């Protein structure tokens, strides 16, 4: 097995394509976006992921090819890595991309090709959506597997080699073929008994993460009502206590955690079960950016008497700061912006990886991390990008307009420095 197609050149597919090329496979990447294909053809990654652009430079045109279609003579294996969004209105899974990808694979390949679904899907989608497209062209002889992507953005290439790879198959032969392929990429394979078991692994992993973080946020919101410092409570609760740690409060977004709970809930309801915890956790995490935005506006009004025309600098527009990413899917700022606009705030914005044009397109004036503080009535640090903690905070605070507010979401800045400068300091559930 030497040639592999990767359908979908987003965060999942592009990193997988580079990882495969690094291991000696000849890779044919496919994407429907002309802009994505143009960038990749020039050796430019259209997204930020450490090591990807270097991989493009090393393998493009030799072991890594990109185009709108798979080669006409097929490939040994295909990985389907297309996006599976949920409806912004109903949150129902939208599987048109998955179906179209399967149809393309069926048209360009044959029954000897191993098809591996890597997109996050509802339980049963590989069998009920992908398989019919393949059997419709090939007949009953199909090799189909599901192998979930479980890496974290910012460390994806490393984790592709280090994390155990779960693999389920339509049958044992399909599963074993996929396991053999992935054994050339990663150190450990975890076989499971079906496509559906592998699909559920991905969903429960992500929903568990969402749930863990939501409890830290709940603790913060409760502590705020008692006038307590949630970080003091959480650190004391965790210290040398041999039980699962409480999570630090913070935003929970991204392309996976913002949609996968809805995919799991939809799949569970389809078989007659309504989850108790999954939806509550997601709802709390979605509420948090709204709560913070309203709190920022209230603090500005408290300081100035009115928020109209006040300058707010927002640092960190991606959905997270560590590991760094430029991904804005599920970013807190999307929920916050309508609140800020309604309050009449004058917005400045900075992110170390999100392009200035993107920030400008969302209605803020792009500035440097240092200039963001100049004349600001308030500064909101959304992400925990480590470079923000390295700023000369006393110097930055000195150029803010007075009275001033600093909302440090992740509590990565020096609270004492802010208080010494006469700046109101607050964080999630604090201040």
Give residue ranges: language-model regions.
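Structural/interface elements that position substrates and couple domains in central-metabolism enzymes
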Residues: 1-431
């Amino acid at each position: 097995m030497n040639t592999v197609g990767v359908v979908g050149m987003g965060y999942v597919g592009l990193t997988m394509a580079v990882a495969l090329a690094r291991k000696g496979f000849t890779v044919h990447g496919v994407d429907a976006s002309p802009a994505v294909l143009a960038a990749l053809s020039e050796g430019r990654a259209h997204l930020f992921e450490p090591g990807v652009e270097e991989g493009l430079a090393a393998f493009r045109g030799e072991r890594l090819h990109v185009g709108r279609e798979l080669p006409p003579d097929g490939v040994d294996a295909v990985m389907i890595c297309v996006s599976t969004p949920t409806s912004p209105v109903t949150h129902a899974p939208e599987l048109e991309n998955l179906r179209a990808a399967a149809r393309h694979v069926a048209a360009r390949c044959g029954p000897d090709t191993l098809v591996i679904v890597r997109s996050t899907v509802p339980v049963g989608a590989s069998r009920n959506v992908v398989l019919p497209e393949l059997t419709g062209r090939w007949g009953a002889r199909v090799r189909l597997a599901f192998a979930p992507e479980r890496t974290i953005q910012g460390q994806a290439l490393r984790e592709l080699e280090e994390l155990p790879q779960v693999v389920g198959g339509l049958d044992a032969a399909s599963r074993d073929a996929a396991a053999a392929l992935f054994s050339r990429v990663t150190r450990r394979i975890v076989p499971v008994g079906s496509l559906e078991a592998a699909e559920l692994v991905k969903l429960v992993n992500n929903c568990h993460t969402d749930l863990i973080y939501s409890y830290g946020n709940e603790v913060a919101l409760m502590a705020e009502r008692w006038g307590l410092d949630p970080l003091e409570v959480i650190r004391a609760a965790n210290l040398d206590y041999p039980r699962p740690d409480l999570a630090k409060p913070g935003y929970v977004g991204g392309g996976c955690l913002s949609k996968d709970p809805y995919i799991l809930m939809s799949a569970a309801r389809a078989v007659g079960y309504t989850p108790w915890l999954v939806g509550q956790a997601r709802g709390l995490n979605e509420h948090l950016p709204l709560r913070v935005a309203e709190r920022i506006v209230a603090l500005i009004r408290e300081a100035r008497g009115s928020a109209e025309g006040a300058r707010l600098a927002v640092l960190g527009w991606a959905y997270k700061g560590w590991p760094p990413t430029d991904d804005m899917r599920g970013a807190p700022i999307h929920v916050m912006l309508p609140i800020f606009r309604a309050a009449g705030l004058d917005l400045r914005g900075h992110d170390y990886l999100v392009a200035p044009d993107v920030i400008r397109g969302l209605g803020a004036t792009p500035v440097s991390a240092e200039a963001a503080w100049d004349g600001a009535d308030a500064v909101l640090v959304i992400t925990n990008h480590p470079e923000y903690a390295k700023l000369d905070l006393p110097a930055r605070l000195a150029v803010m307009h007075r009275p001033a507010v600093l909302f440090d979401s992740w509590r990565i800045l020096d609270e004492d420095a802010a208080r010494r400068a006469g700046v109101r300091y607050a964080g999630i559930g604090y201040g």
